[in-house]
């Protein structure tokens, strides 16, 4: 009973740390965007559903792949945390670019088509990061002290990542559809 409570407390703590890293990455991205010398060359998006999907999905897929692979290594925990930081930076730069290029229409576009799906994807990435940290932490315990978690199940880990990847794909498809509709309505 005590061990279960301890594990739950560690899960809550790791989720809070991952959320903080994501927020710090978002703040860093906003500061970084503000320091850019010229944004006139920025191209926000393509005006097709597939164009919007192809702009957003590769980066989040790369982050998921990084989290998945790094979970199988005992020494990649900094990489797992850095992946969430990178997502926060890219999200903030994207939102800042929309605000800067389109003004109040960009604010409405961001409010309806970027933020809801970005929050969902952030949640899914935090869950993936937590699972990767858990598996790599148990591998670290096994490698360095010989007494890692004996109940580590790679099949369950892979299943969780498949489910989270499926949810992210659905979320990105919905985000692309909503983005396309908002572009037409707001004349962006």
What is each stretch, according to the model?
Residues 113-137, 168:
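Alpha-helical transmembrane segments of helical membrane proteins, especially in multi-pass transport
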Residues 157-181:
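Final/C-terminal transmembrane alpha-helix of multipass membrane proteins
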Residues 48-76:
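Interfacial helix-start motif at the membrane-water boundary
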